[in-house]
């Protein structure tokens, strides 16, 4: 029975994320993610302070500067999130890396007798698995506990800093 439960996607997941922009984070709005079995949807609403700011702008054409929740319809093979947020999600290779890391962490947790967490990852898990410091674009996400996601954990691999990229490129050319 335990094995069968692990293969079923998370039964119900609700997440609320604050969406910020820039290194000196300015609150832009709130994203809501809901999953019920295989069904999932997301909504975004601008924060009132963002809407009142003289330098405000729409994050994308499909998210006009209006009050209230704006729902995004997931296209087949598309993201559940609006395009501005979807652009920060990992690509296919990144998703594979995240899945392998997730499997390795679950295996380690099981060996040490700890809760291994869910077997499958959902859209918000992938969105938040990207390093906050190396995420594409200027959007940053803060979880319900007030922590920017994903903050690098000590002794955990992350995307290499920009300073190391020149060395990595040289090494790849040498191969």
Role assignments for model-derived ranges:
Residues 1-175:
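Phosphate/dinucleotide-binding and metal-coordinating scaffold of catalytic cores
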